[in-house]
Amino acid sequence: LGKIEAVCHKVAEFIGTRARQRIGSDRIEDGKVVMSRMAGALVRAILVAMMVAMPSVLLVDVTTDTQQMVALVAIFAAALTFVEYNAVYPGLVEFRDAKPFNRVRFLMLLTTVIFLSLIERGRMAPTTLTELTEAVGTLIGASMDFPYSPVRLARLMVTDGANEVQAHAVRTAAGMAYLISLLSMALFIILLRAGAWPRQGTPFNVWVNLPTFEPSAGGDVVDRLNRDARINIALGFLLPFLIPAVVSLSSSGFAPLQLTSPQTLIWTMTAWAFLPASLFMRGIAMGRVASMIRDKRRESAVPAGPFLPA
């Protein structure tokens, strides 16, 4: 009996040790996940702050008040990004786990801001790089400036009293921004077709990636996703044409004095090209999610046969 009790004690000690080791390893893994998420959120916040401050860094003759305002906006954007990506549960950012979606959008936004900032810098402190960028932008703007094109309609935001230099600056910035948005959408579609997202065999959480979408609001989820996808794609296609028309009808357009501000021109043309492309990509992503759910339902459906189970 003594030997049996000794063996039982050893088994109990072994099981307890394994349980404690398992709990310790789980805590270590949880700590690694938290640190990894925090590091990723910090890197994203720094990149967003750099993107917001990029025009003020590249441009010359920026006033102190403008620098302070831009720094405040950059800090706010960085804090919002850090809080959003460091949180366990989603808040406002959609497709948080869809790497191509947000990365392509950020790359599009950053590239547009950099190229437009280089073009505007070349008007004050020309260099070889700025002259090359402006020449490419001028060529793109001229090639896209045909009747009823988005670039032609973007010039409606300029008042009739604006001189030729201001109209040329708007056309160059609009052409460059619109081309970058088209290339970004093409890159996003290529990544989807190549299978980079969503990957086969990986779980997809609709709530994490679509926090503002309510699956239990009523109706079939697939039909609602397809409907929202069509609406986003339609808005993404129409907004480059509607925004200049709305601005032209609601007011007399931007005053020529405001067009002399490089940062106003940079952020206006960036938003004009980024918002439609972002809606277009959102519609494509939602359509892809709807097709995923439809395929999962088809795979989990019981195949019809001549006999029914008892």
How does the language model describe each region?
Residues 119-135, 234-252:
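Alpha-helical transmembrane segments and their membrane-interface junctions
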Residues 90, 99, 104, 122-185, ...:
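Long, highly hydrophobic alpha-helical transmembrane signal-anchor segments
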Residues 197-221, 295-307:
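Juxtamembrane inter-helical linkers in multi-pass membrane proteins
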Residues 29-94, 100-129:
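Transmembrane alpha-helical insertion/packing segments
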Residues 56-60, 239-262:
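Juxtamembrane "helix exit" motif at the C-terminal ends of alpha-helical transmembrane segments
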